[in-house]
Amino acid sequence: MIRPLPVLLPPLPDELLSSWLGRHATFYRVSGGRLLRHCGVDAGSMRSIDLALSAHDQRQIARTFRTASQALRRMTQSRGRRRPAGLIATDRPMQVCRRCVIRHDATPETRGARLRSWMEGWRVSCPVCGARLDDCRPMNMLNRASPADPLLARVAEHAAEGEMILEEAVRRNPQDGSAITLMRSLLLPRAHPWQASPTADIPRLLNVVITGFDDFLRDTSPGFRRPGTLLLPMSVRIPVLAGVARVVRRPSHWTERLLPAVGDSARPALAGCLRALGES
């Protein structure tokens, strides 16, 4: 027989389910695993519940916490929808909101809380307070560019627009991956490297849309290679999102410029992406 918890801590805006459960474990001075067992949940880790909450576990937690099942589902990483490939950190946050961290740390019951947006690879600003998100992984922090960098300042407005485009794509129409495909494609090497800046490491397609990106990347992230996922450091993510916004605004205009610049193997996927954007 599952016993409901006598005292419940209210969830924070944008808080992950694992964070909310973890704060209760700390409050009751038990381990996270023990709390899950008390709920009748057999999960490998707290984080696994964020990524794949089964109907059984959802019911068990809802009973223990005297909370509506749908409220729990909305606290998961995908909110019950399909997660966008490569855009969600599976374990540790990519970025944090310093303002929210300070606010959480001011109260023992909220200290250590983690927000959903800290794991999402299309975010540049906090959906709770609007503050700029900051890299928190050591390697990304080492290569962090100043927000006042001329290129970052020049594309900031378009980056915010790109963030909204990705948010819309992920939340409202997860089946349409055009914006995500475009985000990936903009980091592809260009087909004709002799057209690049002579000082660029690997000439990227994004430099066609954001002039000066190749030199910026060389200066701020030497040795950067296109990653297997889209969990990019902020200094790279901001220009990429700005590029997404510019292309989405005028897909037919950019089709003429981007398709000749990309390699043969990547051209069909990019062409399909641009065609879908033009029809949307």
Label each PLM-derived region with a short phrase.
Residues M1-S280:
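Basic, alpha-helical nucleic-acid-binding regions used in initiation and control of genome expression
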